[in-house]
Amino acid sequence: TFGQAERASYDLAKDRVRLDGNAALRADDGAMLVAPRILYQRDNQKVIFPDGVELTQGMTRLVAPKGMVSLAVSDGPPEEIVLSGGVDVVTTVDATGALVEMWAKTVDSRRDPQGNWQVGARTDGPWITVRFTGGEDYFERTLHTLKMNAVIGPDGIISMQGDRGVCFQEIPFEGPPRSAEAETAQAWFSDGQLTDVELDGQVEVRAEQGVATGDRARLVQAGGLVMLQGDPTGRTRVGVESPRGRMSCDQATLYDREGRVEARGKVQGQLVDAQLLGASNTNLGGEPVRFAGETLEVIDKGEKFELRDNARVWQGHRLLVADDIRYDHSSQAVEARGHVRATFPAHEMDADASPDEDVVVVSRSLDYGGLVGRAVFRGSVHYSDPKHSLSANLLSIAFDDNDDISDVEAEGRVEIEDLEFGRRLTGQHALRDVESRTIRVTGSPAQLMDERGNIASGSSLTWNQADGTVSIDGGTELIYYPEEEPVAPGSPDDREESP
């Protein structure tokens, strides 16, 4: 170690050196320490800076009101550096020119066997602040914590950990700014530049108008995404909330730059300002749309949702179940694919129906347009309500301005059964008008079979449900089986049949 100063004094008895006036020490590894006054205790290999010190090594500079350096034996290079009183640190990342700035109340650094510095920072007042500026993908990233440990090598910071409470903010070149809070944080570096940050314990991440919570989160530099996980024991789940709604799941990935969210594992939640199959909009006093499934993808900043694997969506008395369900908020459109099952209130078809009774439609697919107020079911469609059942290739349900069912239209191998009186109507097309309480069936031909097996056919059948009559039009054909009156014992007819 080489030293210089304007004045120097040496205490032979105590083997100590004092340097005053622009004092400086240079170590063999290139570290430079500059201070107004330096006290060198050769007996215990310590250098004390009572009036402040500035330490420079490579691209790193540290400034503190007080400091102490412990040297290796025989006046070797520094092995430990303790700075206190409010420490400022500035490091330049050589590869990109990015800056790392830090403030802490106390900084304690020890050289490890690999030649790296194990740095610990503490504070009992203002939070420790580490600021990264000018990186590849971010204007600025800032870490606040009450306790910090880091490993610094010849090429810059290798890793960093925050403890006892952590706040993290970042402003990317692309995408919205975001912030996060947690109990602890672990940061990784490449060539001295911050890359990924992992947060642990009571995590909360905020971006634009949304907030996500979980037990653990990883903020990934590449792509600007956030990966959140819940507690494996199930005590804490991932939660995501925005003005569009909220949900919970086992794990989620937030793609802030794309405005997209992927959620997995027992996903459930609700949407506000949404409408399902003619149900009242929440702004009109209706209930929110609730959903559940194994996976969920949200795109276009919450405008579109895709729920997969045993998807369920419900609003009030309406329920939709399918393998996959897609929802577009702007058009209020719903698409369902695979094992579709939809449930509506039965009183929308029949005012006399009980509030607990349902209309159920089963099909392979469903397309619903909220703006046009029509739901179309396709593929092996089966419809049932308390008084009727229907099967067809296609079924279309229209909703009026009051969100009630106005008509039901069926196409392709239509079969309608009257569960009250045993009637069966078949044809190629059927239209049920709820207000007039009529069902019109057309086909080649359209047929009616009553409970006795009598058959009436024509080009069209109109069933008036109010009075129970059926009118037949166009090429009418009737097959009638008259009832035989029972034979009285001892009558002539009875004697003729007797042997």
Task: Identify the meaning behind each predicted range.
Residues 1-499:
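Mature-chain termini and adjacent capping regions
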